[in-house]
Amino acid sequence: MGVFHVDIVSAEESIYSGPAEFLVAPAEGGEVGIYPQHTPMLTRIKPGSVRIKAPLKEEELVYVSGGMLEIQPDIVTILADTAVRGADLDEAKAIEAKKHAEEAVRDRASTLDYARAQAELSEAIAQLAAIQKLRKRGH
């Protein structure tokens, strides 16, 4: 099977750079599965898990809070607002963020506050979903 190069970067750091046999990303229109020689594409990504299968390694999970996905036949680049390796996600922190966001949604003072709270809630739920995926794999 062929491979392509993957770069996942956030404003803080490079999270992943290396070869992959396939990758699955949470694109705005739904999950996108990417194999070598994929048709070029540029799309936004939503909060969720990016799954990377590198040659001779177990599948790796990276949580992204949103950003952009660029696909070229031999390289995939994800520019994430925030990116965290799955193993580094903090469940207690994500649960607390979810609880805080739910309270903010209920107690909204303005439309802007409500939109921000909804975004925070969506991000916390996506983090918890990524943690659950890791647990199912036994990591």
UniProtKB/Swiss-Prot annotation:
One GO CC annotation: proton-transporting ATP synthase complex
Predominant localisation class: membrane
Molecular functions per Gene Ontology: ATP binding; proton-transporting ATP synthase activity, rotational mechanism
Pfam families documented for this protein: ATP-synt_DE, ATP-synt_DE_N
Compartment(s) of residence: Cell inner membrane
Gene3D superfamilies xref list: ATP synthase delta/epsilon subunit, C-terminal domain, F0F1 ATP synthase delta/epsilon subunit, N-terminal
Family affiliation: Belongs to the ATPase epsilon chain family.
Source taxon at top rank: Bacteria
InterPro entries: ATP_F1_dsu/esu_C_sf (IPR036794), ATP_synth_F1_dsu/esu (IPR001469), ATP_synth_F1_dsu/esu_N (IPR020546), ATP_synth_F1_esu_C (IPR020547), ATPsynth_dsu/esu_N (IPR036771)
Self-association and partners: F-type ATPases have 2 components, CF(1) - the catalytic core - and CF(0) - the membrane proton channel. CF(1) has five subunits: alpha(3), beta(3), gamma(1), delta(1), epsilon(1). CF(0) has three main subunits: a, b and c.
Role according to the record: Produces ATP from ADP in the presence of a proton gradient across the membrane.
Membrane topology note: Peripheral membrane protein
NCBIfam families cross-referenced by the UniProt entry: ATP_synt_epsi (TIGR01216), PRK00571.1-4 (NF001847)
Keywords assigned: ATP synthesis, Cell inner membrane, Cell membrane, CF(1), Hydrogen ion transport, Ion transport, Membrane, Transport
Name the UniProt record assigns to this protein: ATP synthase epsilon chain
Organism, scientific name: Nitrosospira multiformis (strain ATCC 25196 / NCIMB 11849 / C 71)
Gene: atpC
HAMAP family: ATP_synth_epsil_bac
